[in-house]
Amino acid sequence: MIALIVTINIKPGHKDAFMASMLDDARGSNKDEPGCLRFDVLQDNDNPNQIHLYEVYQDQAALDAHRQAPHFTKWRETVADWFDGEPSRKVCTTVFRAEDA
């Protein structure tokens, strides 16, 4: 499994529109992508314009499919000008899942 931890800073004045588009993408990822095992959207408690994503994919093919999904490409086009700097991304390998306890 591949896990991504993405941090996005949103330009002031764009948070509400960003979140509406972000939640559409998250719903599409969870609902329409069999290889997407988890897609969580988190708001930073100290910075309301900072969003963290926690995404888990079955494998590289599932991650590649996510990046080609219509809801993802629509999201990227919609929010591109609302990023305050480039998002940071950590790619991780899942070692243990709580569901496996």
Features from the language model and the residues they span:
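Short phosphate-engaging motifs
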Residues: 14, 49, 71
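Residue-level signal for secondary-structure boundary sites
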Residues: 14-16, 61, 97
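Glycine-rich beta-strand-turn "strand-cap" elements at beta-sheet edges
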Residues: 2, 40-49, 77-101
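N-terminal first-folded block
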Residues: 2-32, 36-40
